[in-house]
Amino acid sequence: MSMKQKLLLLMGGMMLTAFSLPLAAQSISWTDDSQKPDTLWYTEHKEGTEYTLTKPEELAGLSVLVNTYQYTFEGKTIKLGNDVSLAKTVGEETVLWTPVGLYIKGHKIDIPFKGTFDGQGHTVDGMQVSGTIEAVGLFGNLSGATVRNLVIGSNSSVTSTNSSAQIGSVAGLLTKSRILNCTNHMPVSSPGGTNVYVGGIIGRMNVSGYIGGCKNYGEVSNPGSVGGITASTNKADTVVNCVNYGKVTGKDADNSYTGGIVGYLYEDSR
């Protein structure tokens, strides 16, 4: 068996593991084949550097392309051409959103989005995330990425019962990435624990991240670390010109941190 074949088998096994863990039994996801996620906008135009998405199926396709096929979109820009609603039910079941980019620490799965996502001032609404996903938001895992000019609507809701979750409206985990001029209106919460991070915009920042010009209006709550913009920073992270208007609820306990803007500010952050 060639090295390439071995790698493909390993990747396939990782992805089966990844998708079997986060979602509750029999839940319906936007990335399911039954919901017809559209990946053709990319797979038929891989040579391009800029793509404009206008449909929820195309946005779901982005999740499939990153999480399953591990296209990072590094050096490429994705734009929203209009507001997009992810509100959908099948029978009595809500169709859940699968965040773009995976991070499952215990299984050593780290699959980030590395491109630029420009909302162009448009709103993504109706996003619903629940279950035991570890990195939660429209994006789960960002590394070397930029997300800008994006609005998350008030009819969305994200949470997780994972004991090590990182939960935010825009993204769960941020590494060496920039979040610029983004606004959140939805509630962000977790039943929590001391290892859970919940932020209005970003769950947890992890090394050399930058959040600038962002606003949060949604209620943010978590018994662990919680912040109106982000729950926690790390080495060389920066949060500037951000405003929180939402209610922030934490818990007075050891290793739990609560802040209107940042829950826990690392010594090398600002």
Pin down the residues of each PLM region.
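Nuclease and nuclease-like effector domains acting on nucleic acids or nucleotide cofactors
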Residues: 3, 19, 25
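Bacterial N-terminal signal peptides that target proteins for export
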Residues: 1-11
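Bacterial N-terminal signal peptides
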Residues: 11-22
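Surface-exposed repetitive/solenoidal architectures
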Residues: 26-270
